[in-house]
């Protein structure tokens, strides 16, 4: 189902498509010794080790004391989010970006981040970053190519991707032999994250994006563009699931490799098709013990 009908302007990322994927259910492990373990009933005959009760929240909640006690109610969550947005200058609402940005605004956003450090930098072999390497990295910013007016394009992240200080994979370090912290690594974005694209690198492989939490460079093949309403509306309504484990993965599905074994990190929120027919497969896979979720793809 193609949701973006127009071709991206200025050769922005591939058009956005939403695909279905199976999110595997992991049985949470709890150690509430004082709470008796409920009887899960007879196992299902067609899936080894699976009981129907395992697929319900009630079964797991019954193993906990005070399972229904809220940590934060809706009003408290909204208040905390409001404080975060007010106090953290990096939190931004990309929905409120103007339809046109001046070249100066775009360049300022880029150069505020992409400023070469005054200290010496080394590669992973302990060699100082050569002047010609630095020049090539800085030239790839493409600042002279920013048009006088820029219309932000909107996109969804399709896979876990690094946010970088400069449009390069070149890893740099402050100390010879200490390669724990890459000084060009800023943050990361995850499947379903929404971004506004305002510039492309000279080599065409990187995009400068604004996300809710950060503005930085992301590899172009990690995002799929769509119209603003579709991108901002993704997952905004209807049922959803939030990953609470360190990571989760979609099911292996060779029929749709774009969403096969896709890593989903803690905090990722995806729209779920709660009314998916039990007997109907998803990408050739039986969905009985999984959540059927929508994921953006290129």
Residue ranges and their predicted role:
Residues 17-27:
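Bacterial N-terminal signal peptides
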Residues 199-204, 275-279:
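Short, charged beta-turn/beta-strand-edge "cap" motif at the junction between a beta-strand
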């Amino acid at each position: 189902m193609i949701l973006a009908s127009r071709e991206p302007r200025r050769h922005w990322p591939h058009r956005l498509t939403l695909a279905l994927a199976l999110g595997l259910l992991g049985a949470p492990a709890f150690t509430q010794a004082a709470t008796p373990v409920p009887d899960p009933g007879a196992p299902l005959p067609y899936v080894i080790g699976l009981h129907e009760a395992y697929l319900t929240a009630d079964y797991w909640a019954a193993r906990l004391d005070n399972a229904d006690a809220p940590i934060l109610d809706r009003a408290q969550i909204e208040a905390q989010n409001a404080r975060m947005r007010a106090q953290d200058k990096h939190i931004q609402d990309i929905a409120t970006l103007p339809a046109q940005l001046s070249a100066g605004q775009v360049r300022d956003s880029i150069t505020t981040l992409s400023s070469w450090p005054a200290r010496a930098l080394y590669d992973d072999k302990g060699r100082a970053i050569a002047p010609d390497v630095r020049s090539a990295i800085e030239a790839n910013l493409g600042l002279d190519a920013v048009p006088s007016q820029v219309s932000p394009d909107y996109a969804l992240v399709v896979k876990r991707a690094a946010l970088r200080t400069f449009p390069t994979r070149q890893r740099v370090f402050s100390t010879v032999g200490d390669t724990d912290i890459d000084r060009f690594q800023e943050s990361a974005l995850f499947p379903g994250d929404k971004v506004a694209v305002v510039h492309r690198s000279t080599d065409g492989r990187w995009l400068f994006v604004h996300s809710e939490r950060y503005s930085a460079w992301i590899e172009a093949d990690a995002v799929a563009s769509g119209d603003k309403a579709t991108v901002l509306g993704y997952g905004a309504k209807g049922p959803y699931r939030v990953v609470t484990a360190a990571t989760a993965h979609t099911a292996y599905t060779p029929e749709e490799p774009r969403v096969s074994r896709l890593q989903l990190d803690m905090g990722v929120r995806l729209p779920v098709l709660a009314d998916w027919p039990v007997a109907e497969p998803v990408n050739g896979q039986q969905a009985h013990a999984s959540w059927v979720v929508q994921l953006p793809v290129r």
